[in-house]
Structures are given as structure tokens and as C-alpha cells.
């Protein structure tokens, strides 16, 4: 299905017996490269946004065209959401140098062949609109929280922190099966190629996002109000400037309809620092305990395969 194609039928997409996303398939997909629109994968619907502003899809039929024709898409949606990152030329799907705990040359990753083929063929890919959330959690996760809980990519969820890089990779790759998605799509932990290309897309709107992502939840963010895990008045809370406070997903300011690539939690990627046996993995983007200029969306930080309260992850979806 392409944007503007309203011929797709079908029932609620998503996981088996999932009361939020139902079972079955919404619409169809020809998966042909689209020169005049974005390909919507089987089992998903177009919600709103544009190729330039950040086109949002959802795996719940209830969200279909809710923000059609609008550049900004709200968070009051039912399904898991992804944002299209257009890539006109495969040469633009690349890693970019930003500040980090070590120099750029210390970090490495070979472009996965399946990602290259998908991005080159479809002229883009989808990235999770939010950090991965914990579907079962009724409060923020704590040390020792289960890593068998289901993932969400929705607003108002507890960030899926206290997870190792190995666990994050497994959870991201298993999301497709969890949701009973079509065999034509693949879900993965974000690579450095996908991360940096998403930043490049965002920087068409906010030119310094990779180096100063003040829209996210940082310790030095301006004071703002947010809603706790349960969407009730008693959970209306304030995050004050100068305080490091983890908050639910989708509570800050989106750029191109994407939330918190900078701030809230560091996010595990598949990039490596191979020269280190002690700290061979890479996290990106800073957290609620850091500053937005010192640890912006582009920042790289090496670490061991440990579960931390300030670290979560983000999914990508490839056609």
C-alpha cells in the first residue's frame, strides 16, 4: 500500500491475541519502490506526516489516517509506531562522525548486507518513533526487571531499560515474531548506519540535532510537565531544570515526529569498539542524567554488555 491508497482492506494487524493490535493484517503491500510516495508495509497503516516532515505508520487499523495531511502527528495512537527515513541514494545511508568517549576511528561497523539491499531497493527504512517501551510495566522499570516482557513502540510507556546490549538485540529482532508481522518485514536493533542517517534526516529540520539535541529529556532541559505511566491527572508531573529524571516515552518535543534520540536513556546500537575487550559495545544519544550539549543525539559511548538504568534501545524496521 502506498500513501494515499485507500483500497487496502483487512482486519486489525499485529500480534496474536494482542488486545491492542489484534491479529491478522491491515491492507496489502506491493513493496515496489515508490517514487511518488512511501511504501507502507503489510500489516501497517499510514497515520500522518509527510516524506519531509516524518511519515508515521502504525500496526493498528484504528490509527489509519488519523493525522492525514498533517505534518505533525499526535501521540494519541493505539498501535506501535515507526517513522520513515527516506534515503535517495545508498551512499547517504552511512555512519557519521560525532563526538564520543573515543575518536570516531575507534568505533566500527560493517553495513549489514540485508540492510543495504532493503534501503537501496526501497529508498529508505523505518525507525521506532520512540525508545522501546515495556508493555507490561505499570511503573518505571527497576534493576532486575524482567527482560521477557513484551516491547512496545508507543507513547506513555516505561522505557525498556536495565537491559544488556545482547538482550536488546534479541528483543528487537524478536519484535517481528512477537507482533506476528508479515514475513516481508524485518525488525532489528538500530545500527550506526540507521542511527546516523536518521539524525541526518532530522537535521534537515533542526540543523544541529546531532550536536545539541535540547528537545530530549536531559538534566539541563528547561522545566516541563509530563504524564506518568498511567494517563490520569494524579500522574501529571513536573521535570524541573537541573534534575535528572527518567520519564515515559513520548513526553518531550518531537523532531520530524521522532522522540528522544537525544536524552532520556542511552540507546544500544549494533556498532562496536573492537579495540576494547572490556567495553566493546556502543550506546548513543545521552540520557536524562547528562547535558544536551555535552551528550547529544550523535554522541558515542563505549560500554560492556551490562544492564543499566540509564540505557535502553530503539528498533528499526526494514521492508
Please describe what each predicted stretch is:
Residues 22-93, 187:
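GGW-centered surface loops in extracellular recognition modules
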Amino acid at each position: 500500500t502506498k500513501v494515499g491508497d485507500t483500497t487496502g482492506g483487512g482486519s486489525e494487524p499485529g500480534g496474536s491475541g494482542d488486545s491492542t493490535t489484534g491479529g491478522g493484517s491491515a491492507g496489502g503491500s506491493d513493496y515496489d519502490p515508490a517514487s511518488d510516495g512511501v511504501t507502507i508495509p503489510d500489516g501497517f497503516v499510514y497515520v500522518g506526516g509527510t516524506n519531509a516532515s516524518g511519515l508515521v505508520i502504525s500496526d493498528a487499523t484504528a490509527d489509519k489516517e488519523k493525522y492525514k495531511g498533517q505534518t505533525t502527528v499526535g501521540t494519541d495512537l493505539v498501535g506501535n509506531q515507526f517513522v520513515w527515513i527516506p534515503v535517495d541514494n545508498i551512499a547517504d545511508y552511512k555512519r557519521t562522525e560525532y563526538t564520543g568517549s573515543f575518536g570516531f576511528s575507534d568505533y566500527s561497523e560493517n553495513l549489514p548486507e540485508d540492510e543495504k539491499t532493503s534501503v537501496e531497493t526501497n529508498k529508505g527504512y523505518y525507525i521506532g518513533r520512540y525508545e522501546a517501551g515495556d508493555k507490561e510495566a505499570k511503573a518505571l522499570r527497576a534493576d532486575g526487571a524482567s527482560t521477557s516482557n513484551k516491547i512496545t513502540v508507543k507513547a506513555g510507556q516505561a522505557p525498556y531499560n536495565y537491559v544488556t546490549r545482547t538482550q536488546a538485540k534479541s528483543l528487537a529482532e524478536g519484535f517481528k515474531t512477537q507482533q506476528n508481522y508479515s514475513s516481508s518485514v524485518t525488525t532489528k536493533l538500530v545500527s550506526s548506519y540507521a542511527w546516523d542517517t536518521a539524525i541526518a534526516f532530522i537535521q534537515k529540520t533542526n540543523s544541529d540535532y546531532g550536536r545539541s539535541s535540547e528537545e530530549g529529556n536531559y538534566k539541563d532541559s528547561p522545566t516541563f510537565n509530563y504524564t506518568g505511566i498511567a494517563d490520569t491527572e494524579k500522574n501529571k508531573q513536573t521535570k524541573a531544570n537541573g534534575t535528572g529524571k527518567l520519564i515515559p516515552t513520548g513526553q518531550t518535543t518531537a523532531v520530524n515526529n521522532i522522540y528522544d534520540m537525544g536524552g532520556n536513556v542511552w540507546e544500544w546500537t549494533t556498532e562496536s569498539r573492537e579495540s576494547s575487550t572490556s567495553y566493546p559495545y556502543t550506546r548513543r544519544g545521552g540520557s536524562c542524567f547528562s547535558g544536551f550539549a555535552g551528550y547529544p543525539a550523535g554522541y558515542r559511548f563505549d560500554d560492556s554488555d551490562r544492564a543499566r538504568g540509564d540505557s535502553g534501545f530503539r528498533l528499526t524496521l526494514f521492508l
